[in-house]
Each structure stands twice: as structure tokens, then as C-alpha cells.
From Swiss-Prot:
It comes from Homo sapiens. Residues 1-24 are annotated as: Disordered. This is Piercer of microtubule wall 1 protein. Belongs to the PIERCE1 family. GO terms for biological process: axoneme assembly; cellular response to UV-C; cilium movement; determination of left/right symmetry; DNA damage response; establishment of left/right asymmetry; flagellated sperm motility; regulation of gene expression.
Length: 136
């Protein structure tokens, strides 16, 4: 009967113990304020598993397709204050509702000539047929 069912007599195989995921703190001295996502690079998801066509593959795709290793993770984290953003959220951005009536001076036509869309004859000295532009 044992020959009919050899698997029933065999001892169950214990599952192999998997190594715990690598942490940045296992290799480097990290800051106490380091967020968990930087200490555990295995938490990053969303990296490509399908191989792209090698003809169209760029170096950026090759670099970005790999998940980060513990050697590429930051060791120190410097958080930024969000005080400025909180003030803008409360009051909103400054809006200037004044009317701009200043005539813009042109570097091309000189400081005494204003750019206007209506002045067709004196827009630029190069276009004036009475004198060349080198006479200025």
C-alpha cells in the first residue's frame, strides 16, 4: 500500500525560511528621524516587471525600472516646514487687480521709443525705408 501512495508516507517538508528584507540601518548609520519608507527600500512598489523592447529602451528606463537598494536610500531626512503653505491655504495668494497702463520700452528700438501695436511706421528703424538701421 505504501508503494501505491508514496507521498502519504513522506514526511512533510518544512517551508524554507525567507530572509528578512534588507534595511538601510543594517548597512549604514541612519538618523533617528529617518522615516520608515527610507529605512525599508523593499516597501517601494510600482517598478516595472515586464521587459521593454530593447530597441526602444533608453538609459533612463533602465535606471528607473530597478527598485532602489539600501545603498541608494537617503541616510538622513530633513523635513521642510509647511508654515508658508498653511498661510496660503488660509488666506489665498496675493492678487494684484490694478490696471497696467505703463508703456513698455523696447531694448531693440531704444529707450525713447515705446512699443505700440498701432504705430506701424515707426516700429523698428530697420523697417523704415527713409534711413537704414545703421544710422541710429
Amino acid at each position: 500500500m505504501a508503494e501505491e501512495c508514496p507521498r502519504a508516507c513522506a514526511e512533510p517538508v518544512a517551508p524554507k525560511a525567507t530572509a528578512p528584507p534588507e534595511r538601510t540601518s543594517d548597512y549604514y548609520r541612519v538618523s533617528a528621524d529617518l522615516p520608515g519608507r527610507f529605512n525599508n527600500p523593499g516597501w517601494f512598489r510600482g517598478y516595472r516587471t515586464q521587459k521593454a523592447v530593447s530597441v526602444y529602451r533608453t538609459s533612463n528606463q533602465a535606471y528607473g525600472s530597478r527598485a532602489p537598494t539600501v545603498h541608494e536610500m537617503p541616510k538622513v531626512f530633513y523635513p521642510n516646514s509647511n508654515k508658508f503653505s498653511q498661510q496660503l491655504a488660509a488666506g489665498g495668494m496675493f492678487r494684484n487687480n490694478t490696471l497696467n497702463v505703463y508703456l513698455e520700452k523696447s531694448i531693440v528700438t531704444g529707450p525713447d521709443n515705446c512699443i505700440t501695436s498701432c504705430d506701424r511706421l515707426n516700429f523698428h528703424p530697420s523697417y523704415n525705408i527713409n534711413r537704414p538701421s545703421i544710422c541710429d
